[in-house]
Amino acid sequence: MDLLSGTYIFAVLLACVVFHSGAQEKNYTIREEMPENVLIGDLLKDLNLSLIPNKSLTTAMQFKLVYKTGDVPLTRIEEDTGEIFTTGARIDREKLCAGIPRDEHCFYEVEVAILPDEIFRLVKIRFLIEDINDNAPLFPATVINISIPENSAINSKYTLPAAVDPDVGINGVQNYELIKSQNIFGLDVIETPEGDKMPQLIVQKELDREEKDTYVMKVKVEDGGFPQRSSTAILQVSVTDTNDNHPVFKETEIEVSIPENAPVGTSVTQLHATDADIGENAKIHFSFSNLVSNIARRLFHLNATTGLITIKEPLDREETPNHKLLVLASDGGLMPARAMVLVNVTDVNDNVPSIDIRYIVNPINDTVVLSENIPLNTKIALITVTDKDADHNGRVTCFTDHEIPFRLRPVFSNQFLLETAAYLDYESTKEYAIKLLAADAGKPPLNQSAMLFIKVKDENDNAPVFTQSFVTVSIPENNSPGIQLTKVSATDADSGPNAEINYLLGPDAPPEFSLDRRTGMLTVVKKLDREKEDKYLFTILAKDNGVPPLTSNVTVFVSIIDQNDNSPVFTHNEYNFYVPENLPRHGTVGLITVTDPDYGDNSAVTLSILDENDDFTIDSQTGVIRPNISFDREKQESYTFYVKAEDGGRVSRSSSAKVTINVVDVNDNKPVFIVPPSNYSYELVLPSTNPGTVVFQVIAVDNDTGMNAEVRYSIVGGNTRDLFAIDQETGNITLMEKCDVTDLGLHRVLVKANDLGQPDSLFSVVIVNLFVNESVTNATLINELVRKSIEAPVTPNTEIADVSSPTSDYVKILVAAVAGTVTVVVVIFITAVVRCRQAPHLKAAQKNKQNSEWATPNPENRQMIMMKKKKKKKKHSPKNLLLNFVTIEETKADDVDSDGNRITLDLPIDLEEQTMGKYNWVTTPTTFKPDSPDLARHYKSASPQPAFQIQPETPLNSKHHIIQELPLDNTFVACDSISKRSSSSSDPYSVSDCGYPVTTFEVPVSVHTRPPMKEVVRSCTPMKESTTMEIWIHPQPQRKSEGKGAGKSQRRVTFHLPEGSQESSSDGGLGEHDAGSLTSTSHGLPLGYPQEEYFDRATPSNRTEGDGNSDPESTFIPGLKKAAEITVQPTVEEASDNCTQECLIYGHSDACWMPASLDHSSSSQAQASALCHSPPLSQASTQHHSPPVTQTIALCHSPPVTQTIALCHSPPPIQVSALHHSPPLVQATALRHSPPSAQASALCYSPPLAQAAAISHSSPLPQVIALHRSQAQSSVSLQQGWVQGAEGLCSVDQGVQGSATSQFYTMSERLHPSDDSIKVIPLTTFTPRQQARPSRGDSPIMEEHPL
């Protein structure tokens, strides 16, 4: 039961809320022509008003239809039930909505007021009137006449007048039918853009006016209603003569606007139509179509001849806002032209607003009587204002003329409710005459007024009135109870019992006060405390004895005066502040908050720091603490002091609190790497390392604390193809993939260490150099790589000094070797033939060479030469190949001219592709000034030693030998002699760094001299024989020195560097051979050439003495036992013919001695590269070195004499010197043995690949030499006694089978750091002549890989 009652109450409240929300609308649908007393709807149910119980209302619910006096309503409503019924008035849609377009709905609206005021609502009810088929379609005339020319084509169509049906929709015209057409004509129905159906007559057979000139039939029209209605008309077709051109309107659709107050006769529009015919057939007749409404025909006139449309009667937009005029233009034919004229009648403010007053409160003699105590918002009447104008002209506002306690509240468009806006007072105003004004927004505006009268009924509505509206009283705290404060009084305008007043304390009065009921005296009954309550605000009531009684109130404000009875109170007994250590001096540390319950000066607190602490200050008023010092958490982490608070009372009170300031760490330290210690350290990573192995660990520390000291690691650059990964917490660098040959070399990994500090994280970076190789044997070289790599920018996935392995370049080397060898053999053969025929032209060619240009790179641009693997194998042309021929010959003791066992080492190498970096002569700046001399053409020496004077040993008329006087020092440093553009500048302008660490190595060279023995080197004086220099190197059985006589066992090493490209530095000779200029030599020449066709040059075109051209006069070294035979050709007269004045200042240039450049194919015929040592070795001075070291010296030879070098060893440390050359020559490999080892060099053969066999017994320095045997017939013989204690000599059964992974360079520590970069030695295969271990009399033969 409770649940049901609760639901009912909720529904009632919901209904009240709905009704309280404002006006409502309700829509109903009715059909036209409905009979009387038909139930339309029930508002009580439709608006859910049945949920409101009648017992909660003051009066019963009523429904009142609000309509204008004089109107005949189409509906009525039952006042008690809210049911809506039809009345006896006819509901005719066509009449009610005559002015509404046919395609719009027809509505009828009424308003219903729901009473009483508790639930008052004004409901607007809209009735949608549905059309019924109560009208039949009718033709405009019962007889329709139409003319058709006799030559009309079959299926020609002629428009017939359309029928009109006042009904709409399906009840309108739907179909046309032709009756008794005799199959001559047919009928078609088309729909116009306006939605009207137009009948068209179709000619189905040929017409002949002479045979029959008139056809009579019937046309029937039907609607779609139920029941269906129809009508017929007689159609008379007249066959006329031919008129084959129809009129054509210039514009078929015209829209015009005309104001509704336009006078009669005003032109609306001018129609223009043309006809291509002539004569009578071209005369156009204008007429309205029968579809034009009668109203339009009444208002507009169409001139049949000119087509001018004018106003026939005054227009009224309120009656019809627009008109559609369908105009036909006919030339007498059956196909008139059609044009639609849309006339929009614009509004003119010509209608005065109307005011319609519909009373909700029943008036008495047109006067509404209201009680003065009626509630606010009491609805009095519904005011409706209308204006027939449109837009702003029809926008009406309604208002009253002066201030009254009533207002107009809009509920619908142009409808207002008159209701009370204030309480009525009979004593002030007893009657109201309200003037209502309605005005539109036109220019000028039109207005209308109406009067409404209201009388006020008197009631007991006066309450007592206090003489003071606000009472203020003050009293000190700690008072005595019973003190009287004040007296209040009030008056009442009423009389009698209604004027008798009683005083009462209001419900908000505190218990500390009491009030006398009759006198109004206010008294304090308790002791007051201002700290508990500093003021009291309450009301005092004055109540009369009326029925019902009326009351009024006055507000009393009691203020408590403060006394200093409280000490200052800190918000905390102890304050702890946390400040960052980087807080600036005098920054804000914190705020001390102190309260004092007292008021005024008693609560004015002053703060100070006790104990005279000068480290901090405190604002005495705000309590802000600021430091006078700079914090450093590492020195002191906290500070403690006391703060005193003292109030400003007459007798002051104080208190104190402890303050502790804690210094908090800030992220002011970057992580610092301790491992690796610097960017120059490196770590070895073996290529065989398994993926997932930790290859290195970086360690960084942060001096901060907490999260500011937490370090995270990441790789931010230099990680080639993600080969490495790093653990962000431990710093362990892990190898992610298996290393292949492409990964060998130095990897520069950029590691970033950042802390987790907030708000900004700090970081540091370090370069971790990871060297991927089998071992670290040349630390100096790696350090140099690392040093130079620091100068290169670090980009993502950067690999520094990529080391190409023999395995990855094996195919490339083989292709280069085959192509180079075959090409050089063919070119040398052709060149040998051609050069024999070109001797007369060489002089002119030499002069042309003087005009060659020399380029000089900037020595300041030191760049790390990056050796990167080629993505594609280039086709090696002969000009990119250089063949190094090394002939090591052993002369029989009994026959110095014997050609016995010889081994020729043919060393093909593509230095441009595999070894030497290309120098960019376009982008590299030079140090030349525009007006400076060409220092590249001179070789000025800064050495204090005098230049050598070469004494010729052959006649001066020899045209194959040119000797230049060169200084002792190396004043020329070049990048490489076989690159595309070899540097040929002097030292101050030369390239400062020509090293290629990844592909070269070098060995220090020192000469061990002894006191004079039996053999000395003969001085270089003119003689018929070759000049010979003998150098004693290690003890041998005493033999008589016989020069080149029998019984003298010696080892000859001859180096020949035939020119392989246009960039080669060696000269190809000067022309045909002169027999008289040659010295006697007994050994075979390289590539099997005849002696007379092989030419050498004493000084290559781009070399100086420092590059290996030792002066022949420096060959006198006294006290040498063994000798290296050096044949020096005499100089020629042309040596100084071309010298200029600049030569006296800057030194001799190439123009003094260099011949003109020859054809590259022919110049490769007989090139010989001079193998020279640095200045100390090329001079004639005697140098004494430590006994264990025995070196072999490579000295320059002058062409065409083949030079020989005797290779000897000292007893305990069997060491072989490096055939070392200063740049840009390609240096020979070093055959080195560590001192404790008395082992010989091992010449090992690796069958699988043409790899270089390691010729070394020093484990930390595994040098590799790669040698190829030439395809020519030359050979080199190795004496078994060449090395003593040859325990390590490898035979076939002891060959190194695993040499496929050997490198033909080393990365270990450089043995000679002061020298320039180490040069490349090409690959060579050593093969024994026999399968067995060679005996003492046999020597292994070094053969080229059989490609």
From Swiss-Prot:
Q: Glycosylation positions?
A: N27, N48, N54, N344, N553, N773
Residue ranges of region Disordered?
1031-1050, 1057-1091, 1097-1116, 1325-1347
Q: Which UniProt keywords apply?
A: Calcium, Cell adhesion, Cell membrane, Glycoprotein, Membrane, Repeat, Signal, Transmembrane, Transmembrane helix
Tell me where it resides.
Cell membrane
Q: Which SMART domains match?
A: CA
Show the stretches that span the lipid bilayer. Answer: 813-833
Q: Which InterPro entries match?
A: Cadherin-like_dom, Cadherin-like_sf, Cadherin_CS, Cadherin_N, Protocadherin
CDD domains noted in UniProt = Cadherin_repeat (cd11304)
Keyword field contains Manganese: no
Signal peptide per UniProt: 1-23
Q: Which GO terms describe its molecular function?
A: calcium ion binding
GO BP term (any one): homophilic cell adhesion via plasma membrane adhesion molecules
**Ranges for the Cadherin domain?**
26-139, 140-249, 250-355, 362-466, 467-570, 571-673, 677-795
Residue spans, topological domain Cytoplasmic: 834-1347
Topology in membrane: Single-pass type I membrane protein
Q: What the protein does?
A: Potential calcium-dependent cell-adhesion protein.
Q: What is this protein called?
A: Protocadherin-11 X-linked
Source organism of this protein record: Pongo pygmaeus (Bornean orangutan)
User: What are the leading ranks of the lineage?
Assistant: Eukaryota, Metazoa, Chordata, Craniata, Vertebrata
Q: Which gene encodes it?
A: PCDH11X
